[in-house]
Amino acid sequence: MNDKIVVDVLKLYLKRDPSLTEFHMLKSQYKNIQRVNIFNKEIFISLIKKNKKKFFSDIKSSPSDIKRSILTYFSKQENTYSIGKLYTIIELQSILVTTYTDVLGILTTKGPDLFTSNIYYNTSSMQSLARDALNFMNVAQMTDKTMGRHNVSSLVDNVNSLMEEYLRRHNKNCICYGSYSLHLLNPDVKYGDIDILQTNSRTFLIDLAFLIKFITGLNVVLLKVPYLKNYMVLKDQNDSHIIDSFNIRQDTMQSIPKVLIDNIYIVDPALQLMSMLKMFSQIDRLEDLAKNPEKLTVRLATLLEYVRVNYGINFISNQTKKNNMPMYSVIDIDKRIITVDTSNYDFPFKKCLVYLDESSLSSDILDLNADDAIDFENVSNSAFLINNNILYTYFSNTILMKSKTDIHEISSRGLSAHILIYQILTKGDIIKPLTDIVNSLIGVEKNPIYDIIPRDKKSGKHGIIDIEKDIITH
């Protein structure tokens, strides 16, 4: 590349002659800087204004405020002399100019025809079953602590409106799960933010962060949490939650069974039901249950009604046949490994070794010299490997004990649900074990928690993207 051309591009970008250090350090960014230089900011400003009108109409900011905010950011480099900060500004501006139109700008244009779904689940027959099942699981003490996920930003409703359209336009690479997906099946389910899985989380959240910044003037930050794989959360300046997203590979996306509702793909509720049963092994989720059992009752009833209708599951109130769920599980507390007997089902393995420490699982997989482990990322929170009729996997939640040696039924069911998640994702045998696990919710004893085996502790530092401070650490 001709040095004079590079100097001219840098001079146009910085609105000053670049120093020798700036020239040598920034010339590798020539193409990105050139894209920013030729970017049509007037069209971009128009897109942001349309986004505001459609999704943030209640926010009090004028068109001139928005224009000023955008032009100020695109001239920020002119008064920045730190090479590190310049790199950050260039990276973020480059993401905006190359992706915003396709990611968020498109949401203001006319979309494809909406094929309204007639799917609606009347859960009245499942309400009693769900309420009884949750009552038997309601064995934790209420606490006053507030989990981070409960501190919700005032911008959530605006972002939810945007997300509904985003899910329709980008339904090949973004799907939803959780309370909003159940709301689409049953309007009685209330939801807060919208839980999503997508293949381009980082780009989407950066574009959304800028949209919020330009419209509201607020500084929002993106955090990457070390103990959750490929997870990012967008927070406002009060550290309140706006939206989060798990990033997954395209092959993982293709493995997930989905249901199309109103042009939005949701994770198959059978898979969501298994995730919910698995979740109850986590002690703080049982504390949530103790605080608000009715909220979870309508969600569980919706999931149960879905599997009843779509999987032909029969609920048997007076069970005469032996139910093999939860599958028999034995824990080695010192090794933190649980052995689950899976021999009663037509699985491609006869037992399962469930590791409570992910590093131990990884080490043992290496020792087995096996290279066919499957990792479904955040969908399962574990890799899986079948070797010599044994399924090896990792369980990321706490284990509840009902005695010094016996695993509590809540955790045994959670372990069984984790194994069924593997079966669902690999399209294996599911109907018989699914029938058994949902029927295992009927007529169970309510046992107190004797002890709690802690979950695997993850180390690492939080990553951050702070637009205002020109910081990127992930």
Curated annotation (Swiss-Prot):
GO terms for molecular function: ATP binding; poly(A) RNA polymerase activity. Its EC number is 2.7.7.19. Belongs to the poxviridae poly(A) polymerase catalytic subunit family. SUPFAM superfamilies: Poly(A) polymerase catalytic subunit-like (SSF160957). The keyword Repeat does not apply. It comes from the Viruses. Keywords: ATP-binding, mRNA processing, Nucleotide-binding, Transcription, Transferase. Heterodimer of a large (catalytic) subunit and a small (regulatory) subunit. Polymerase that creates the 3'-poly(A) tail of mRNA's. CDD domains: polyA_pol_Pox. Pfam families: Pox_polyA_pol, Pox_polyA_pol_C, Pox_polyA_pol_N. The active site is at 193, 195. This is Poly(A) polymerase catalytic subunit. It catalyses: RNA(n) + ATP = RNA(n)-3'-adenine ribonucleotide + diphosphate. The lineage of its organism: Viruses, Varidnaviria, Bamfordvirae, Nucleocytoviricota, Pokkesviricetes. InterPro entries: PolyA_pol_cat_Poxvir (IPR004976), PolyA_pol_cat_sf (IPR037265), PolyA_pol_nucTrfase_Poxvir (IPR024231), PolyA_pol_nucTrfase_sf_Poxvir (IPR038419), Poxvirus_polyA_pol_cat_C (IPR024397), Poxvirus_polyA_pol_cat_N (IPR024398), Poxvirus_polyA_pol_cat_N_sf (IPR038337). It is an enzyme of class 2 (transferase).
